[in-house]
A protein has these predicted regions:
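Extracellular attachment/recognition segments
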Residues: 1-84
Length: 84
């Protein structure tokens, strides 16, 4: 397994954003997860959903929707793990 950060983002309070990343080999098993980089205690800060587009026979595009669950702006990293 290997991991990385694909992008960094910021969402205003209670906002939702959508990002995409393309050209991922269709044979890879990729897991996406978001990590807030703005500390805040007491409750979850973000939630996300992942949708997949089979762009061609060999590649995928991932569409990631991220929702800020707080009233404050949140900075975060869009991270991935490629499972072996």
């Amino acid at each position: 397994m290997w991991t990385g950060t694909q992008w960094t983002g910021t969402l205003a309070g209670n906002a939702t954003g959508r990002w995409f990343t393309f050209g991922w080999p269709a044979t890879w098993h990729v897991t996406w997860y978001m990590m807030p980089t703005s500390p805040q205690i007491g409750a979850p800060q973000i939630d996300w959903e992942v949708a997949v587009e089979r762009a061609d026979p060999n590649a995928c595009t991932y569409w990631i929707t991220v929702r800020n669950l707080t009233a404050n702006a949140v900075n975060f990293e869009g991270r991935y793990a490629v499972l072996s």
